[in-house]
Amino acid sequence: MARHETSFPEILDVAALRARCDFIASAHAEQREPMRRALLAAFKEANIAGRAKARELLAADGAGIKCAERISWLQDQLITLLHDFVLNQVFDAAKAPETSRIAVTAVGGYGRGTLAPGSDIDLLFLLPAKKAVWAEPAIEFMLYILWDLGFKVGHATRTIEDCIRLSRADMTIRTAILECRYVCGSVALASELETRFDHEIVRNTGPEFIAAKLAERDERHRKAGDTRYLVEPNVKEGKGGLRDLHTLFWISKYFYRVKDSADLVKLGVLSRQEYKLFQKAEDFLWAVRCHMHFLTGKAEERLSFDIQREIAEALGYHDHPGLSAVERFMKHYFLVAKDVGDLTRIFCSALEDQQAKDAPGISGVISRFRNRVRKIPGTLDFVDDGGRIALASPDVFKRDPVNLLRMFHIADINGLEFHPAALKQVTRSLSLITPHLRENEEANRLFLSILTSRRNPELILRRMNEAAVLGRFIPEFGKIVSMMQFNMYHHYTVDEHLLRAVDVLSRIERGLEEEAHPLTAMLMPAIEDREALYVAVLLHDIAKGRPEDHSVAGAKVARKLCPRFRLSPKQTETVVWLVEEHLTMSMVAQTRDLNDRKTIVDFAERVQSLERLKMLLILTVCDIRAVGPGVWNGWKGQLLRTLYYETELLLSGGFSELSRKERAKHAADMLEEALADWPKEERQTYVRLHYQPYLLTVALDEQVRHAAFIREADAAGRTLATMVRTHDFHAITEITVLSPDHPRLLTVIAGACAAAGANIVGAQIHTTSDGRALDTILVNREFSVAEDETRRAASIGKLIEDVLSGRKKLPDVIASRTRSKKRSRAFTVTPEVTISNALSNKFTVIEVEGLDRTGLLSEVTAVLSDLSLDIASAHITTFGEKVIDTFYVTDLVGSKITSENRQMNIAARLKAVLAGEVDEARERMPSGIIAPTPVPRASHGSKATKAET
């Protein structure tokens, strides 16, 4: 069995450490415990110094594999010296016959001769058939020394017979022994295991092993997140990570019987260029992994936000216009992960060909390898190979480069998967995608047909992207392939986000999203130009990573690409407008007061037509849905629907104060009718409690629930009451609070929710005509079981009641319960405050932007109240680590804030809070605000707060 072929004397002076061991043995010959302590100290010193040197060399040369080999070699020397010392000095087994000696072997990753700084050390101690009495005590002594050195040691003590027997039954053990490497002890014993394992386990079991390893890989990808474009990837286990490369090597070693990955070139499995790609990918991933372990001081495998910036710096990345150093580093990472995917595909193609040559029937072992070949109607260039599109001849692409697009189109219309050999040939033919092909009318027709397919366009586009065809055919798309945005909001790379957005659009059109998006599902069939909509969805983030605003830059890109796709001038203008305005509807819905007519008027002026409004709504839904899991919720859907309906009324000529009054009166009549089982006078009195915004924005079934809640509280004589309800579909929980109104009520409720660890996703805040507040706070669900979530919500409601009643003080509760989020500490968001009197006819609009943290909303609102500002409505939107809070305010007499000096003071106080500076307003946060004579928050009687966290 192979040992390290290279030594690294700069890491450890082996002779010097051996001499020190000899000195320890002679100095403590009769005292085992002092001997053990001295030995431990010597090894600890050598290990620390060796690893420090390995880290220093990694920083100097950036060689990831070399670093892993240095640490593995260091580990080998320590184990060898320890083995020799224990057998010779502790157990006096130096003269034991060869037949009774043990062998120490490395397995797992350590067996490959590479070891990450924080990785486990996996050892297999081989015993002879007839073991010596000292064997197991000696192994135990060695293990205790290794544990005391701080190593995490995975170990097994077995005979060769045990190894063979267990390998037959357990694929994990079989894989470990496949990588078994001799470290020290009996060479004969280790060699015998290698020979018997090869003859008795490996021979004639290749298909079984391959099937198991590929199934294991698929399951690993599922657990780690089945995309290589998650922005916090697992470098070891994730898709496109080191384990995928290891899987290729395991299969190579098992099936092709190679000792080194370089042998795959000799066998024709990989070309010389592809092998260089393999080496570069492995070296880069090892460099990243070693830096991660050194930086964190542990076996950290997830490349999380809080270490990405430091890893980028360690690897020597620098800022470029439009892309920060960390974003450039992560783009490189995802491109490497994509290369690993390409290599996997090429490898599987060669593997299938080899199996077909060796034993035609064996290809059934891997489920997708089938041999039936049929003609495909309408083409002579491609065939159906067991449900997968394959090439009819090797020169298909060279003869006609348009076939590089046509293959994907034919696969789409015939519902075919892709033969790995076909994709391998695509990868090797990318140079055929020239400027001439990009302008080819037929090629662009085929592409547009793929994009707007009524089947599953995302699947075909994804295959095109994985094969690098999409980025070559549309170079502007190629620039955003594997590009990540360094923030907590976007879960995927830009190209992955765009493909997912197309998928959402396709699902809406195919009627698969009616429950989640009823309005868009209703509007989609009536869209006049679906081609323009699909193109806009694909291109909406095409200009990310550029110095200028990506919406404006993206519109320029769209204006260039649309004529190339053979879109008409009218279609081009539609796409350009949609790309430029793709963030507008979301921002207006989430950060503006939708009950303020000027909000609707200003938005309608930008939209100008009902058709544009419909298309922008659908694009907005696709964009938010494709950001990542948990970003979309029912509250966002409600906001977008409200904005859509109000704007639709205005654009169709039906929006007026009179129409709003008529709609509010109709809503009041509906509520009174729904309360038919109440006495007439009581229900009429109740309906008069509510103002116009409440009646227009709260659903009737919610109004009925509120009525029962308020009636019950009044009957019980309760000044303060809370009610909770969970929503499975929207994944939110409602906490409704009935309380005497107070200018700082929002501060208290937000603070109590933050202290309870509840992530606010929205709020509906209304004031009744008798001076009470009826506030419904929406928080993210924490538990999937309704009973558990209801108990949690009740505890949050109880905390709100405790603070409002004065039983607990808000500053104390927040200080004791809130903690900063570790992940958000990796980011910086420059505090910004914008104060405008142009966005509303009645209110001054204050927009604050900064780094989100627990309790920020309560602190900001406390400062606004401290500055004698009345908050009419608040709109809290969080994009990952960044929060954008918008407040519609007046002074205490209901006027706008027009004084420049006062505006400057407001901005300064808010910036200080956003920056985390201590503000005296926090110490004066109110508690026990329930009073016999409440002070109302605003004269207009109703407010709406919107938040996403």
Curated annotation (Swiss-Prot):
Enzyme Commission numbers on file: 2.7.7.59, 3.1.4.-
Q: Where is this region: Uridylyltransferase?
A: 1-377
**Keyword ATP-binding: yes or no?**
no
State the superkingdom.
Answer: Bacteria
Q: Which Pfam families match?
A: ACT, GlnD_UR_UTase, HD, NTP_transf_2
Q: What is known of its domains?
A: Has four distinct domains: an N-terminal nucleotidyltransferase (NT) domain responsible for UTase activity, a central HD domain that encodes UR activity, and two C-terminal ACT domains that seem to have a role in glutamine sensing.
Protein name (Swiss-Prot/TrEMBL) = Bifunctional uridylyltransferase/uridylyl-removing enzyme
